Every structure is written in C-alpha cells, then in structure tokens.
From Swiss-Prot:
Lineage: Bacteria, Pseudomonadati, Pseudomonadota, Gammaproteobacteria, Enterobacterales
Keyword Cell cycle: yes
The protein's assembly and partners: Homodimer. The ends of the coiled-coil dimer bind to each other, forming polymers. Interacts with FtsZ.
Role description: Non-essential, abundant cell division factor that is required for proper Z-ring formation. It is recruited early to the divisome by direct interaction with FtsZ, stimulating Z-ring assembly and thereby promoting cell division earlier in the cell cycle. Its recruitment to the Z-ring requires functional FtsA or ZipA.
Entry-linked InterPro entries: Cell_div_ZapB (IPR009252)
Name the record gives this protein: Cell division protein ZapB
GO cellular component, one term: cytoplasm
Main location: cytoplasm
Subcellular location: Cytoplasm
Amino acid sequence: MSFEVFEKLEAKVQQAVDTITLLQMEIEELKDKNNQLAQEVQNAQGSREALEHENHQLREQQHVWQERLQALLGKMEEV
C-alpha cells in the first residue's frame, strides 16, 4: 500500500518537474522574443527619426521653391 502511494507521489513530483522544465523553456523563448521585439522597436524608432528629419528637410525645400515661384509669378505680373 505505501509503495503505491510512493509511486503516485513520485509520478506527481516527476510531472511537476517536467512542467517546471517546460515552463522554464517557454520563459527563455519569451525572453528571446521580447529582446527581438525590443530591438525591432529601437530600429523602428531610428527609422522614424530619420524619416522625420527627411520630412523636415523636404518641407523646407518646398517652402523655398514656393517662395521662388511666387517671386517669379510676381515678376511675370509686372511684365
């Protein structure tokens, strides 16, 4: 009788150990995925900053061209 109880207890302990091992593996996978996603976020932020800078430069260029065009149109009206 006590041998059967010991076997059941041993099986439950082994099941708990197996579950813990699987959960530890899952935690490691999730940590790796989290690190990968954090890197992707950093890359996206860098790309965003570069695009914002480019957008700012293009807006400035557009403003300069609009001023030149307005000046040319003003000269054409004078003629």
